[in-house]
Amino acid sequence: LRSRGLGDVYKRQYPSSFLTLPDGMKENFYWIQMYKLASATRGDRALIDNTGPWLTVTPWPNAWWNLNVQLTYWALNASNHLDLAASLENAIYNNIENLKKNVPEAYRKDALAIGRSSNLVCESGEIGIPGVDKAAEVGLLPWACHSLWLIYRHKMDDELLRNKLFPVLKQAINYYLHFTYKGKDGKIHLPQTYSPEYGSAEDCNFDLALLSWGCRTLLEITGRLNIDDPLIPRWKTILEELTPFPTDPANGLMIGRDVPYAFSHRHYSHLLAAYPLYLINKENPEEYDLIEKSLLYWQGKSG
């Protein structure tokens, strides 16, 4: 804080996020996070990748979109720092052409995507094709759109919603729409995709949750903004006919159809329907039991 300019930054930063907690350790942790985030980005600068501005030797020197970016930005909403969250908005909204190039060429007309890791302008290389490439990790931009949705919900800026978020979310969900199919059971299914850092499965819970959330959110947006989009019937059909989340009677949510959660992993991608998407909710007694069972099994796995 010897630099007057830097001192002014933190004088502005801390009052905006002021919070006291009865537990001193938790309060200290909170303030450390606020300091870290203020050190790592500005609204008009690069998004926060795995190392931020600190140069260090690491196997992960990029922006990783399968968990890291999303979790990093959550803290900025409720802490009253949408000014810093703008770095994520700008990274996505200002790099649409790069997001288009991340999609295999045959689908670039109406779809956007981002791969597991990218540079600071969202160039990741082409993502996989569901049902063709075993590691087709296709839900990462929809998950990033959930972070953009949370930012919008704290701003409630409908011009931003109409001109920025809606087009990106629509095209992110469009990639799924190229591959959904109706099974003999009359339900809509997804071919094999990749659950982040775990493995591949048909009807992958990670992707079913994001597809469902995306369609629900697109319908909410079109209703709010009175947008008469030609895909509205398709989104409604998906919500009505999408196959249920694959579950195990004893252990809860699975990775996907016929693929159990069998070994320990910190990524909780198969649980996105419960959190942060809230497609299943603890207020429903049956869903509460499913959430509790799934969490206990996920946390109880060792190895």
Give residue ranges: language-model regions.
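Single conserved hydrophobic/aromatic residue that forms the stacking wall/gate
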Residues: 1-10
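Structured secondary-structure scaffolds
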Residues: 19-94, 108-109
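Alpha-helical scaffold segments in carbohydrate-active enzymes
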Residues: 28-39, 91-94, 98, 167-179, ...
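Secretory-pathway/luminal and periplasmic proteins that interact with or process carbohydrate-rich
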Residues: 37-46, 59-65, 84, 97-102, ...
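Short, glycine/acidic-rich hinge or "gate" loops at secondary-structure transitions
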Residues: 44-53, 161-164, 181-190, 227-231
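Carbohydrate-binding/catalytic loop surfaces
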Residues: 51-63, 108-131, 187-206, 252-265
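Active-site core of glycosidic bond-cleaving carbohydrate-active enzymes
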Residues: 65-102, 109, 122-129, 133-159, ...
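Acidic/histidine-rich catalytic neighborhood
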Residues: 171-224
